[in-house]
């Protein structure tokens, strides 16, 4: 399979910083407890920013660093489980905001924490067939939208932010990826549109950690 070169990256974060001490005012926890178990000291929670706004900011930074213009892109992929809307796809919203060419396909991948890896593998497979050799890959979440702030097991871990990369197909670049899946909603589950009776994500952190160590 063709490989990829990462030409430029970018990121964008909401302005609102939430510290461990902030969360300790709401749930039974402390800065020391969180840091000792996760290494996390703060996270960002969006108050007014949309995923599209953050994604466009990150994408523009990646394009600038890569020296690639939006009109040179042949593919636009977004990895997310918390898009601004179900349709149009998050990738299409980014496509519109950046005024990408109409022959530049854009679609989302929903694969949780592995989403960006899926996006890289997908772009490596598709780019040789696209009109231009560059792809914009965006990975981002606004997980504060679906996180129960009274659930200590999840609210201390998740936050909001976006990363982006501009990649180029390269048949000579070394490339190896081995993808798989193990679907289990008892371990990790996030709500879909209209699921008001279960509005928050659920995660069995110990099982996810075990799976990551043994398999990922």
Model-identified regions with their sequence ranges:
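Condensing-enzyme catalytic core mediating Claisen C-C bond formation in acyl metabolism
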Residues: 1-48, 151-214
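Conserved beta-strand elements of the Class I
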Residues: 5, 74-77, 136
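Acidic, glycine-rich active-site loops and adjacent beta-strand->loop/helix elements
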Residues: 12, 79-84, 111-114, 139-144, ...
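Short acidic, glycine/serine/threonine-rich loops at helix termini
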Residues: 17-18, 87-89, 120, 147-151
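Conserved catalytic cysteine-centered active-site region
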Residues: 33-37, 41-53, 81-134
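Phosphate/pyrophosphate-binding loops at sites that engage ATP/ADP/AMP, CoA/4′-phosphopantetheine
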Residues: 58-74
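Short, well-ordered, mixed-charge alpha-helical segments that flank or form enzyme active sites
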Residues: 85-87, 115-118, 143-147, 183-185
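Flexible, glycine-rich active-site loops centered on histidine and acidic residues
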Residues: 128-161
């Amino acid at each position: 399979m063709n490989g990829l070169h990462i030409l430029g990256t970018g990121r964008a974060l909401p302005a609102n910083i939430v510290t461990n001490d902030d969360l300790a005012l709401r749930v039974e926890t402390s800065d020391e407890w969180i840091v000792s178990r996760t290494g996390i000291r703060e996270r960002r929670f969006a108050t007014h920013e949309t995923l599209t706004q953050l994604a466009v900011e990150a994408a523009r930074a990646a394009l600038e660093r890569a020296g690639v213009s939006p009109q040179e892109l042949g593919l636009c992929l977004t990895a997310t489980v918390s898009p601004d809307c179900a349709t149009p796809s998050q990738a299409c919203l980014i496509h519109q905001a950046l005024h990408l060419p109409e022959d530049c396909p854009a679609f989302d991948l929903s694969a949780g924490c592995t989403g960006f890896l899926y996006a890289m593998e997908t772009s490596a497979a598709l780019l040789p067939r696209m009109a231009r050799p560059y792809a914009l890959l965006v990975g981002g979440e606004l997980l504060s939208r679906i996180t129960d702030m009274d659930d200590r097991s999840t609210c201390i871990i998740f936050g909001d932010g976006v990363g982006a990369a501009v990649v180029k197909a390269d048949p000579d670049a070394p490339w190896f990826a081995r993808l798989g899946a193990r679907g289990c909603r008892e371990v990790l589950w996030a709500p879909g549109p209209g699921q008001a009776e279960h509005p928050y994500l659920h995660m069995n952190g110990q099982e996810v950690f075990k799976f990551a160590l043994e398999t990922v």
